[in-house]
Amino acid sequence: MNYMKWILLTAGLSIILAVNIFAQENVIMPDLTKIVSGDGWRVVNREPEMVTENGQSCVHFKAENETGGIAWLENVDFNNGIIEADLKGRNARGRSFLGIAFRGVNDSTYDVVYFRPFNFVPEANVKGHSVQYISHPKYTWFKLREEHPGEFENSIVPPPNPDQFFHVKIVIEKPKIKVYVDQQEEPSLVVDELSDRTGGKIGLWMDYVTEGMFANLKILQAEE
């Protein structure tokens, strides 16, 4: 190998190494076991417990009342990037709504990408209500469905098993949001954000009467 080739190879390896190190520094993998103790997390209207489901350790949120609930990750300000997690709801019609909140300001002001597992069954999935984006407090699911039908919710093809964990990857590059389910190459939902907020908290979100399980939360902060 001549000197010039050695220089180019060394430079290329240095760049790759630097990129990998930089990427690792921007990856956050929160410890979900700390949700139970409240260390670095703040839980609203839910009772968390650690359980093992199908061999996987996860946090289970019990619905003690009919109000919505959320677990806020403290001390992380998320702007753009990727949020991944494994979620499990229930195949119970009208009683399972869970997802990932971001752009969180307080307990009533945030954006959410959430899922309706009871709509994963084929006869319901075709109606286009399996995955939804909302922006509270102004843009509720009802307002968006009424004023922008089919724009902020969609089917998932192929749909996950409503009684099992499913993997979610949410790519956020303001104003664009893309939602991928179970390693699919094509997004199940693509929308433009409705809020003008930048940054904010990330949370594990459940609507009213919803119990939920969450595992393997991973956050990749985009380079600013």
Named regions from a protein language model:
Residues 1-11:
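Bacterial N-terminal signal peptides that target proteins for export
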Residues 9-20:
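Bacterial N-terminal signal peptides
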Residues 24-224:
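Extracellular glycan-recognition regions
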